[in-house]
Amino acid sequence: MPVEYTVLASGAPGVFNLGGDLSLFIELIDNRDRVGLLRYGSACVDVLYRNYIGHGLPITTISLVQGECLGGGFEAALSSDIIIAERQSRFGFPEILFNLFPGMGAYSFLDRRVGRKQTEELLSTGKIYSADDMLAVGVIDVVVGRGEGDAEVAAAIKRSSRSRNGLVGIAGARRRVNGITYEELTDVVHLWVDAALRLAPRDLKLMQRLVSRQTDMLASSQIH
């Protein structure tokens, strides 16, 4: 049978995705390695764009968030057609805290969902938001209780099965009328690289602090 749905999820308890490899960012910036930064950013948008277009097939993509969803991880979730989150999940873009911005699709994906004003507020504050916060402004689609995410994914697939042909058509129309091109994503990657190479030493020190926090959070998820 043909694949009709894909689900992005995590096997790490309490963590969906903590975002990009900040240690690598610091190394590439210290070395003034523009090519390396472009290669990294391009590899990221390659993956997210394929998910965004349903891999070029009539596939509905779903992100199931059951924990921390930050930075590039949030961008990954946003690339799906449907975002389902458990209530304990948290969302945010911390990049502004070290004077950068998320450059692998965040603006494009958010703008199509919630418009410019809400997008720029989410990107420019560095705040961490609850799943209910994100549901209230239309960033995500469904919030369920802790441990109920898998069942909700199955239920969502079942609910949509009767109208699947029409829903696939609606998704195609959405991409045609208000779509995101690969060129748009790669253009923003170039803007991100330019901004990264302008970071000052104090910004890189702040980034290094977040590396330590990422490491601690990952270690905690593996213990549990």
What are the functions of these language-model segments?
Residues 52-68, 79-90, 97-99, 103-164:
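Crotonase-fold acyl-CoA enzyme core
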Residues 38, 71, 128:
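Glycine-rich phosphate-binding loop at the start of an alpha helix
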